[in-house]
Regions:
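Catalytic core of nucleotidyl cyclases, primarily class III adenylyl/guanylyl cyclases
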Residues: 49
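DNA-dependent DNA polymerase catalytic subunits
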Residues: 2, 10-43, 52-305
Length: 305
């Protein structure tokens, strides 16, 4: 391969999206007589997120459905503007053929960005499909990750809906209720799912595991060690390379002498570790930390002051 080809693709992509950004800003500033206002709230490799509040305010529509209908038509006009400017770009770079096209994806009334490619949108229309009730589009946020405990996935989605449509007090009340429910769940429901790799690499005959062992691998090695110590390997299979596991933090002190344990399906009762599950740490890391990533952006708290 030739690195210059890769660089050319990257630079061409950057030029294309920036060209579209300039075209949309110029069109909206001219249409709304706003001078040099930046209407682009976020950009990605091949997409623009455009704020059209000023346009909606100008026409004086308040009915939500009519606003969505108006924005659908307005986006059609913006598509035409982008197409015209891409024709000019093709001529500018002496392109063999003009192949660049941008289409409207979603219409949303609320959006929260925590970082690049990490956002929540309250979507009313997606590529021409109109929703009776708005649906959340969640990208890069913890709720949609497979590493999030099962007990938290739906609750994170629910609380994101509250953040979009409710108040800070509503959010705090939900957290308080879910925390009470969370502390009543079993270990399997609150543990972090992972795939375990490197059991041989990180195993140490003297100390069970080596330094810098990933926490879920550490928990797996401890689990296997306890099985062998308690002579339970005929009753429960050991954790093997490549298997799916779940790990949870433990209160200190506890019978393992460590802060974590991993399992495959369920925690063997012979381990006698149920009362040592650290629900406070699990709740903080599985629910509060990803939630704070969103709440910090809008200046809300997770508890009453």
């Amino acid at each position: 391969y030739d690195e210059r080809n890769a660089e050319a693709v990257s630079v061409a992509g950057q030029l294309s999206v920036q060209w579209a950004e300039n075209a949309v800003n110029k069109y909206l500033n001219t249409t709304l007589s706003t001078g040099n206002k930046d209407y682009i709230v976020a950009m990605d490799t091949d997409s623009l997120y455009v704020c059209l509040d000023s346009l909606v305010s100008r026409i004086g529509i308040t009915d939500k459905e009519k606003i969505i209908e108006f924005l659908d038509k307005a986006c059609g006009r913006i598509e035409e503007v982008i197409k015209k400017n891409y024709d000019e770009l093709a001529e500018y770079v002496n392109a063999y053929q003009q192949k660049m096209v941008m289409k409207r994806e979603v219409i949303a009334d609320t959006g929260i960005w925590t970082a690049k490619k990490h956002y929540i949108l309250n979507v009313h229309d997606s590529e021409g499909v109109r929703y009776e009730e708005p649906e959340l589009k969640i990208v890069g946020i913890e709720a949609v990750k497979s590493s999030t405990p099962q007990a938290c996935r739906q609750s994170l989605k629910e609380i994101f809906n509250i953040i979009i449509s409710g108040t800070e007090d509503d959010v705090i009340s939900y957290i308080e209720k879910f925390k009470e429910k969370f502390f009543g769940l079993n270990m399997e429901e609150v543990a972090f799912p992972r795939s375990v790799n490197g059991l041989k690499k990180y195993k140490d005959p003297a100390t069970i595991y080596r330094k810098s062992t990933p926490i879920h691998v550490k928990g797996s090695l401890i689990y296997n060690h306890i099985l062998r110590t308690k002579k339970l390997t005929r009753k429960y299979p050991t954790i093997k390379e490549g298997e799916k596991v779940k790990f949870t933090y433990l209160k200190d002190p506890n019978p393992t002498g460590d802060k974590v344990i991993s399992i495959t399906n369920s925690l063997p009762k012979e381990f006698e570790l149920e009362k040592y599950i650290d629900y406070d740490t699990q709740f903080e890391k599985a629910f509060i930390e990803p939630l704070k990533g969103v709440l910090d952006v809008i200046g809300w708290d997770t508890e009453r002051r």
